[in-house]
């Protein structure tokens, strides 16, 4: 049981580190992070950011190794559509009339603590 709990903690920590890296990356590339880990009954958005007049809904996927495919492959069409719907809901709830774009930031961590980030814009 301890091993399972430890693995869950490691995954959570990896995910948090990935989201922090993604937020810094987005900021360096001209976006303003509005909110992180926004939740409602229909789901969660990892990062909400603004770039010019566009509200950007960002899904962050961090993976340690390629065993289960790349991080970007983990975000399928169903997930992309759900993220777009969540973006519209956030915008409505916050009185935001900006155009909405869904991006995915995939982070792959390889042995030797090598972190690789890939940003796909406008996936939905």
Swiss-Prot record:
GO terms for molecular function: nucleic acid binding. InterPro entries: Restrct_endonuc-II-like, tRNA_endonuc-like_dom_sf, UPF0102_YraN-like. It comes from the Bacteria. Belongs to the UPF0102 family. This is UPF0102 protein Tfu_0669. It comes from Thermobifida fusca (strain YX).
């Amino acid at each position: 049981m301890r091993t399972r709990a430890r693995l869950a903690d490691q995954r959570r920590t990896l995910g948090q580190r990935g989201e922090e890296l993604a937020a810094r990356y987005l900021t360096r590339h001209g976006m303003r992070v509005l909110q992180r880990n926004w939740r409602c009954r229909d789901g969660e958005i990892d990062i909400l950011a603004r770039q010019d007049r566009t509200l950007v809904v960002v899904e962050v996927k961090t993976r340690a190794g390629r065993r289960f495919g790349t991080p970007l492959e983990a975000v399928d069409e169903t997930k992309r559509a759900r993220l777009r719907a969540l973006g519209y809901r956030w915008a409505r709830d916050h009185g935001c009339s900006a155009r909405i774009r869904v991006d995915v930031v995939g982070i792959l961590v390889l042995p030797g603590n090598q972190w690789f980030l890939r940003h796909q814009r406008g996936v939905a």
